[in-house]
Amino acid sequence: MEENIFINASFIPSENLVALIKSLKKNQAVFLEDEPIAFFTTEGQEVDFDTYEVTEYTHDDVLRIEHTWDIFAKNHEAIQRDFHLVTQGRTSQPIPETAVAFNKENIFIEEGAKLPLCSLNATEGPIYIGKDAEIMEGSAIRGPFALCESATVKMNAKIYTGCTIGPHSKVGGELNNSVLMGYSNKGHDGFLGNAVIGEWCNLGADTNNSNLKNNYAEVRLWDYETQGFARTGLQFCGLMMGDHSKCGINTMFNTGTVVGVSANIFGSGFPRNFIPSFSWGGSGGMTTYKTNKAFEVAKIVMARRGIEFTEADAAILEHVFEETAQWRRG
């Protein structure tokens, strides 16, 4: 490491921020108030910001992910920014004649996308349809919305504002202000709202999450940093699910539920609102989901998509298993 620019990953890049970071020279840093955004350092240099030439970031376009719930809460704005960056200077594929579209100039369709007999309403925000993505007939979508490459919206889906569907993922039923990462499936009826779903997850048919408490109170969410339930400041907050987790048919998740990595949830009733990584069970209790069994499933799931489960993948998940052991009971 002779020279490096370190970047605070919680800041979502904007054109102004990227330009400023690219202009950094040795011993220079960019701060937002007391928080470092980026700094240029060398191998022999200690990270002592008193010795740095500090530039204060003064633009009003800061978008920062400070908590897990920010991923969905700030997704409306993130989609609008990305839409501008991805589409500027480019021409969309034509909107099919069989599709009903509102505010067409706010809709961008990549090559190979299929969207017959669907409704696209970009009045409240842009709609982006990725390469080789498909929106099946009868689906109704409101922007801001992003459907990434080779992702699928199943027939008669209802998708409200602020949703992003990651590459190669499949969604159906009803979604509102939710983010699914790549290669995850919510392919059937059921409601997912104010939620974040990691990669390689699968939600069984008629899985539902609550995103509003019956008493309309502020939602508290498990926080790994404090090892307790944090105040979100939100009235609407649904499900946070880590990579490789699965749930069976008719699973019900309570308001503000956090599911860790590689958990397997099934059965009737509401499971607890914090399910540690590598948990196996449901409302009746949890046992430990052994890594050898979890890895067998991951290999099968990933192979179906033509992707190898590598030694690096296994090492990462083993590390997560060890780090989260303190929260598992069985």
Where are these regions (language model features)?
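Surface-exposed beta-strand edges and their flanking turn/coil or helix-capping segments
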Residues: 20-21, 77-80, 86-88, 122, ...
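Conserved beta-strand and immediately adjacent loop positions that scaffold enzyme active sites
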Residues: 3, 117, 262
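Short glycine/proline-enriched coil/turn segments at helix->beta-strand junctions
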Residues: 2-3, 25-26, 135, 180, ...
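Glycine-rich hexapeptide-repeat left-handed beta-helix
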Residues: 155-156, 168-329
